[in-house]
């Protein structure tokens, strides 16, 4: 995949961080949207 044979750790951290932020954001957005629509 990569020329050096392994993925740099900072790239893994950035991708993992973005993924966590996206999942948490979607979770809270869905929760607030669900509560707002139910009320």
Swiss-Prot record:
Membrane topology summary: Single-pass membrane protein
Cell compartments where the protein resides: Cellular thylakoid membrane
Presence of the UniProt keyword Thylakoid in the record: yes
One GO location term (cellular component): photosystem II reaction center
Keyword Membrane attached: yes
GO annotation terms (biological process): photosynthesis
Residue stretches spanning the membrane: 7-27
InterPro entries in UniProt: PSII_PsbJ, PSII_PsbJ_sf
Protein keywords: Membrane, Photosynthesis, Photosystem II, Reaction center, Thylakoid, Transmembrane, Transmembrane helix
UniProt superkingdom: Bacteria
HAMAP family documented for this protein: PSII_PsbJ
Function according to Swiss-Prot or TrEMBL: One of the components of the core complex of photosystem II (PSII). PSII is a light-driven water:plastoquinone oxidoreductase that uses light energy to abstract electrons from H(2)O, generating O(2) and a proton gradient subsequently used for ATP formation. It consists of a core antenna complex that captures photons, and an electron transfer chain that converts photonic excitation into a charge separation.
Subunit structure: PSII is composed of 1 copy each of membrane proteins PsbA, PsbB, PsbC, PsbD, PsbE, PsbF, PsbH, PsbI, PsbJ, PsbK, PsbL, PsbM, PsbT, PsbX, PsbY, PsbZ, Psb30/Ycf12, peripheral proteins PsbO, CyanoQ (PsbQ), PsbU, PsbV and a large number of cofactors. It forms dimeric complexes.
UniProt xrefs under NCBIfam families: PRK02565.1
Entry's family note: Belongs to the PsbJ family.
Protein's name in the database: Photosystem II reaction center protein J
Native source species: Rippkaea orientalis (strain PCC 8801 / RF-1)
